[in-house]
Each structure stands twice: as C-alpha cells, then as structure tokens.
Amino acid sequence: MDRKNLLRRDLRHNWHPYTQMSTLATEPPTLIDRAEGLFLFDAEGNRYYDAISSWWCLVHGHGHPRIREAVTRQMERLDHVLFAGVTHEPAVRLASRLAAIAPEGLSRVFFSDNGSTAVEVALKMSLQCWRNLGREERTGFVCLDHGYHGDTTGCMSVSGVEAFLRAFRPILFPARRVPAPYCYRCPAGKTHPGCGVSCVDALGDALREGGDTVAAVILEPLLLGAGGMIAYPPEYLSRAAALAREHGAHLILDEVATGFGRTGTMFACGQAGVSPDFLCLSKGLTGGTMPLAATLTTAEVYNSFLGGPDSGKTFYHGHTYTANPVGCAAALASLDLFEEEGVVDRVARLAPRLAEGVRELAGLPLVGDVRGIGMVAALELVSDKGTKEPLPGTAPVFREIRLEGMRRGLFLRPMGNVVYLFLPQAVTREALDDILDRFGGTLRKVLR
C-alpha cells in the first residue's frame, strides 16, 4: 500500500496516544517502515536515530539478532498459555533471573504486560497485604508532585503531572502529594549540594500526618520521567526509604523507565543502596521488543497472602498475557546480552560524555536548566532565565525543534517545556558523538 493511502487510512481509523488528533490533518504522523540498530527508517527511506528509545524502552537496538532468534524459537514451541494453574520454562527461568539481579530481599515475581499494570499490581498488593495482616487502616499513599506512574486509575491517583490527571479527577482516589526533589525549582529555596536535601522533610511531614493510615510511599528513583526528566540526588532516595521504614509504610519503586542500566546501574535504586518492598519493571525488560512487565516483592509480603481457600487472602488480579512465553524469551535473551556485552558498564562509561555534550548548550537562549543521568539528558526551556518562567509546551519552538531534528536525522519528541535525549544503552561512543553533534546543531539553529 502506498504512503498516501496508508496515512489516509491511519487518520480515518487510528487514535494515537498523547496526540491532539486535529493537528494530524495538516501534519500527518511519520510513517515508519522498519528499524535496525539505533535507527528508524521512514517509508521514504529517510533514516533517524531513535533518540528517545521509542518511548524509553529500547536497550540493545532494534532487531537485535539474539532477541529475534529467541522470540522465533519460542513462537515455534509455545506462543501463549494462561498462567493460572499453569507454568512454563521461560517464566520460571525469567523469575529466577530477576530475583537474582534484583535488590536484596525481592524474591517473588508477579508478571503483567506494561508499566502501568506493574504499578497497579504493587498498589493493590500493598493494600491487600495490610488488610491480610489485620491493618485495614493502612489505605493511603504518599507520592510526589511531577511523579508519573502510568495511565490506569490507581497509577494516575498516585501521579502528580496535572496534564495527565485533569480530565479524570472524578474517578481518582486521594493521595498525599509532596513537593518533588526538583533542584532547578527547589521547593525549599536552596541549592544542592549545600541544601542537605532538606526537600525530603516534606515527605517526613506527610508520613507523620498520615500516621498508621499510610500503606506505601511510591517514587521513581533518581529520575522523574514524564514529570520533566527531573534527575535528583541519591541522598533523597536513601532518606525517603529510611522515612518509609521509620513510619512502617511500604516503599514502592517504579523503575519502569530507569531499570535495566538506563542510569548507569542495573537498577537506579542501587545508587542509593535502597531495597524496596515492591519494584516495578517493564519497558527495558525485554530490551524494548515485547510487552512484558514484572512486579517484584518480598517473602514477607508474599507470605501475608497465604491461607486456606476461604481465607480471603488470595490476590485476585491477573492479565490474559501474564508471563507470556514469547515475552519471557525476549527478556531472557536481553539479560544474556547484559552479561555478555557489559551493557551497564558501557552506560556508566559513556554517561559523562552525554552530560558534557548537552551542558555545552546551557548558554543558548531559552535554556533554563540542563540535567540528566546515565543515558538521559534534558534541557528545560524557559521564557525568562531570571524568573525561570516555563516556556509553554505549546510554543512553536518545540515543533520547530522536532522538525529540525528530523531534518538532521534525529527522532525527538519534546515533552512539555523539556527537550530531551533518552538514548538506547547500545549506543557507541561514535554514535553518541554523532547524536550530540546533530542535537546541538538542531538546538543552535532553532534557539539562536
């Protein structure tokens, strides 16, 4: 089918996510035909670096032969089977591998199919765990402004990005939100590192106010993704974990975006020496190739669900594609590549170069802040550097950046007033230098 006909049918039937569809009538979506390695290719043969890892999930590059072969073999043997009263080798092996590499104490794995469901599972497990233990008063959650945990109802209820919540307030449950550790816009009016990370005090206050009614604290460790690519110090996370423990609340860490080496360690929470009660994983779990998610938890939580058939302690939650064998096979192949190719070490080695390259753009007009961690780097654009007034996300400059990036072979998708790179862990030094050159050229031309 030719390009024009495909796009015409797309606009007739498809409803794209996070998209004002009326704009596509004059500026249709990019028709991607194939992908290979670090690149996307459109239907006209143009090549683009996948500079946002296809929404933050790509790890080893597109079409890695090892993952492709693992998926093909599994499809030929067992494509899918329910996971209630049934098990299979890929799920058993993957659960064992995840428990082996996870932070200490996380020995139980519940599979689902995307990041939102991984978080939803953690929220429900925390609530029911307390109920099973006779602590039914613990029903509340503490979360962060600018935090984002997914688009299902529970996830939205503990998120703090207003654009995603505004239309759905009537169906959300209340949660205690505290200011984010947002160094550029410090809620305490201080400057890191001399601040003593005093912004965490608000979290302590919320836990004291909530008392025995708080079920869990939920955080994205070290990087608030959809809230603006806000990187924050490991000290905040370690103190937040200590506060949750002090007040007897569970700690849920959402590593859907940060897991699997993205920040320079296998899991971001490792940089703070933190082991949560629940760890939520997806995106990079399969190397970014197949829908799969996992919620890891402790033996203590797991044991609270054990009882007789009539005990009321069973966890009544599941998904059709729970532990899909093909997804598990992809994840196992991805984990093999981590071990064989030194993926995490490569990220740690190249992260300073990414940070250095983006810092060179700090002096450009409208650039208020430059931040990042690991393979993530972001620029926050402001209309006034003195007042830090955010540039509206609807400002024409963001469209210009996206289009200029594509002209230079970079696939970018600015988010609000933030322009960012979220690079695959497979990036080489040569490719990184090329990406930075194209990214810098894009910003300098548009913001000059």
Positions of PLM-derived features:
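Conserved N-terminal phosphate-binding loop of PLP-dependent enzymes in the Aspartate aminotransferase
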Residues: 1-448
